[in-house]
Regions:
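Active-site catalytic microenvironments in core metabolic enzymes, especially phosphate/sugar-handling
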Residues: 1-226
């Protein structure tokens, strides 16, 4: 398949103009080949993923996280990424995580999604644990029930104040730092950067599976519970 036609499918879903100014979504490595036969879908491209792609005879990688520096060895295969544009678009990264919990969210701003549902912290914890087994709960005030939950997949603590302004009593995101946890006045869940975003591979797959042969990269969180 023509690789530019393939990318057009992704960009029709998550337009590049949605990406943040600092982001580098789009073509990370663009070779001279026009047609591709097999594509690998990954959350993050690193040396292991690149070797997987080579071993699986993939001639292109589509990823969520971009590479900010390109090892010379990576330049022999097309690499395309959809990062913050995929985070913002409806049906993207955060929406996919919320859907996996069996919940429905509404957009608030560009990145935040809000779920309005009366639910106990215990029940919400159980839902989250099924998707993110190593998630951590922060509940400094012993709150038993919540009714307005803000979500941001990946690293979302810069949206904490926005969640508070929207009168949310719970915030679900990843990469929560210690002092953020100590200062938290609402319920928070650190669900992990990897765990909250890995499901985006299903979105990529759904977009292109009928157009080309797809291989799903074998990826694991770099963090291990000891």
């Amino acid at each position: 398949m023509n690789k530019y036609d393939l990318v057009k499918i992704i960009e029709n879903f998550a337009p590049l103009e949605l990406q943040e100014k600092w982001d580098c979504s789009g073509w990370i490595v663009e070779t001279s080949q026009i047609d591709v036969k097999r594509v690998m879908i990954a959350l993050t491209v690193d040396e292991k993923i690149f070797k997987q792609a080579l071993n699986k005879n993939c001639d292109m990688i589509i990823s969520h996280h971009p590479l900010f520096s390109i090892p010379l060895a990576f330049r022999g295969i097309d690499i395309y990424c959809a990062h913050t544009n995929m985070d913002k678009v409806l049906g993207g990264t955060t929406d996919t995580f919320i859907e996996a919990l069996g919940l429905n969210g509404s957009p608030e701003g560009e990145f935040l999604r809000i779920v309005e549902k009366n639910i106990s912290v215990k029940e919400l914890s159980q839902k989250i644990k099924k998707v993110s087994p190593n998630a951590r709960l922060i509940n400094n005030n012993g709150i038993q029930n919540v009714s307005k939950i803000a979500f941001c997949a990946g690293s979302g603590m810069d949206l904490y104040n926005e969640a508070i302004e929207n009168k949310c009593d719970c915030f679900v995101t990843g990469d929560i730092k210690y002092h953020n946890a100590v200062d938290a006045q609402i319920v928070m869940f650190d669900v992990g950067h990897f765990e909250s975003e890995i499901l985006i591979k299903k979105v990529f797959y759904g977009l292109i599976k009928d157009k080309i042969e797809v291989v799903i990269a074998d990826e694991n969180s770099p963090f291990k519970t000891i």
